[in-house]
C-alpha cells in the first residue's frame, strides 16, 4: 500500500513539475502572419522535439499580452523593443530570448498630396494607434516640433479613407496593405527607417522568473522558435498555410492575400539592412541608439543595454 501511495505521489509531483515548466505564449495581437514562426514551430513539432511544452494563447482587446503576463496568465509574450525597454526600466522582469524584427516597420502614409516630407506634417491631422505602437511616433513629433493633431484609431483605415486626416501612421505589413488594397497605392509613404528611426521591433520575451528557474527550457524554446522562423523563410507558402489554419481555428476574419503580404514583409524585417540572411539577436548599437532617444525624452530613467535586456 505504501509503495503504491509513494508511486502516486511521485506521479503527482512529476505532473506538477511539468505544468510549472509549461510555456504559455501570448503574441501581442490576434492570430496573423506577424507570428508565423511560432505557429510553424508548434504545428511541425519543433517545440516538442526541443522538449518544451508550449501553448499559444492569443490576446484580445480587453486582455493585452503584457497584462496577461503581469497577471500570470502567460509567461512569454511578443513585444516591441521600444515597449520592452520602457517596461524593464519601470521594473517589469522581462528577458529577451529571441529578437525577430531587425528593422522598423513603421511608416506614415500621406493623404494630402501637399505633404512631401516629415516637416510638412507640422500642424496636420494624423491618424495614430490607440496602443503602445504609437510611442515612437510621439517622440518623432517632439524631435521635429511638429505640433501634430493626433487622431486615434484602433486598427482600421476608415479615418484615412473618409478624408478626416491628412496622413496616418501604418505598419508596413498591415495598414499599408489595407490602404493599397483600397485604391491608395500611389500615395506617398514616409518610412521612419529612412529618416533616422530604424530600430528593431518585435522580439520574444519571457519572465525573468521562468528564465532563471528553467534556463535550459528557455533556451530550447528560443531555439525552436528560431527554427520555426527559419523554416518560414525557406517555405513561405507552406508557412502561410499554417497561419491560415490558425486564423480559421481562432475565427479571425482575414484574407489570404493580406496574410501573404504580411508574411513577406515580416520576413523582410528580420533581415538587417545590407544583409541577405535573417538575424535573431539584438543589435547592440541600435539598442544604444534607442536608449539615447528614450532617455532624451524621459521615457526611461536609466541606461539600458542589450545585455541587460537579454538577462545577463
Over which residues does each language-model region extend?
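Bacterial N-terminal signal peptides that target proteins for export
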Residues: 1-7
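N-terminal signal peptide c-region/cleavage motif recognized by signal peptidases
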Residues: 13-17
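N-terminal hydrophobic or amphipathic helices and topogenic motifs
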Residues: 18-55, 273, 281-312
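Short, glycine-/small- and polar/acidic-enriched structural segments
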Residues: 21-153, 157-171, 198
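Pocket-lining segment of extracytoplasmic ligand-binding domains
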Residues: 82-83, 155-252
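Structural motif detector for alpha-helix initiation sites
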Residues: 117-118, 208, 306
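Short, surface-exposed acidic
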Residues: 147-150, 187-189, 249-264, 301-308
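Secondary-structure end/capping motifs
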Residues: 214-297
